[in-house]
Amino acid sequence: MATNIVGKVKWYNSTKNFGFIEQDNGGKDVFVHKSAIEAAGLHSLKERQEVIFDIEEKQGKAYAINLRVK
């Protein structure tokens, strides 16, 4: 698991409850689900919002967890 990754919200669809975060280090975009946002005490994410997060791999896919606003 990669930790303390810095990135910006690429987009977030509050109707579908998911979106993607661009990593500042140039890595692949990371999926973010509403559950990770709620676990961080947030209601939603805004495009280009700066965040810090960890990446968890599940079944070959990267998920943002432990989300924090920068």
Swiss-Prot record:
Coiled-coil boundaries: none
Matching InterPro entries: Cold_shock_CspA (IPR012156), Cold_shock_domain (IPR050181), CSD (IPR011129), CSD_CS (IPR019844), CSP_DNA-bd (IPR002059), NA-bd_OB-fold (IPR012340)
Domain of life, source organism: Bacteria
UniProt key word DNA-binding: yes
Name listed for the protein in its UniProt record: Cold shock-like protein CspA
SUPFAM superfamilies with a match to the protein in the record: Nucleic acid-binding proteins
Organism whose genome encodes this protein: Rickettsia typhi (strain ATCC VR-144 / Wilmington)
Pfam families: CSD
PROSITE patterns from the UniProt entry: CSD_1, CSD_2
GO molecular function: DNA binding
Lineage: Bacteria, Pseudomonadati, Pseudomonadota, Alphaproteobacteria, Rickettsiales
Subcellular location: Cytoplasm
UniProt domain CSD: residue ranges: 7-67
Keywords from the UniProt entry: Activator, Cytoplasm, DNA-binding, Transcription, Transcription regulation
Phosphoprotein recorded as keyword: no
GO cellular component term of the entry, any: cytosol
